[in-house]
């Protein structure tokens, strides 16, 4: 156990930047418009060092894993409470859309066979100086494919006497992850309710 502790080091770093802004306004009575923009950017790095004196290890080994990515979302909605229907009827209509995009990349490097006098910091500063004759080095680099989605949605809410409720929704989602011939999915739904507690 002591040998493992003395010959094993792990360093992980993560960074994230996020921005979320929203704007809401009411141009006319009953109509509320809202737009929201969200941005997220992230980076991460992990350094793993295993010395040759650790249990089960023959060589000094350095492993470096890196990743980065982003996610953005922009949504806009219009919500209108219909005016002039009297006290018995309430009708609300909402329409909107949402656009999002994301992507992630990753890379992995493993170097084996560094000189005994090297420590973790020196090895990671000179990862290309591993012992290539061992044939144990590994390299992998993945460039992610951007993913995009576009959604349109709408909702109608109606109530009579605040007792009898009806809701209808419709959503259409398009995604770059869907098959080429079927980029869109459609999701309609209806619901009804009755507030017994409001009955006279």
Give short role names for the model-derived ranges.
Residues 1-3, 48, 52-62, 105-139:
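Surface-exposed loop/turn segments flanking beta-strands in extracellular/periplasmic regions
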Residues 169, 173-174, 191-193:
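Alpha-helical hinge/cap motifs
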Residues 183-193:
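Short secondary-structure subsegments characteristic of cysteine-rich extracellular domains
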Residues 192-200:
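Metallo-beta-lactamase
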């Amino acid at each position: 156990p002591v040998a493992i502790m003395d010959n094993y080091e792990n360093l992980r770093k993560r960074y994230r930047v996020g921005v979320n802004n929203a704007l809401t306004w009411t141009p006319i009575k009953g109509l509320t418009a809202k737009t929201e923009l969200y941005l997220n950017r992230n980076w991460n790095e992990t350094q793993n060092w295993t010395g040759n004196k650790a249990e089960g290890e023959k060589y000094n080994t350095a492993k470096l894993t890196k990743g980065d990515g982003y996610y953005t979302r922009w949504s806009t909605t219009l919500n209108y409470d219909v005016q002039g229907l009297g006290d018995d009827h309430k009708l609300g209509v909402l329409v909107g859309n949402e656009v999002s995009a994301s992507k992630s990349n990753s890379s992995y490097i493993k170097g084996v066979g560094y000189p005994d006098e090297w420590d973790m910091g020196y090895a990671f500063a000179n990862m290309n100086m591993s012992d290539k004759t061992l044939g144990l080095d590994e390299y992998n680099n993945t460039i992610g494919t951007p993913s995009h989605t576009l959604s349109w949605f709408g909702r109608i809410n109606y109530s009579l006497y605040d007792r009898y409720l009806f809701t209808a929704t419709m959503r259409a989602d398009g995604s770059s992850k869907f098959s080429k011939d079927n980029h869109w999915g459609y999701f309609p739904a209806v619901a009804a309710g009755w507030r017994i507690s409001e009955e006279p």
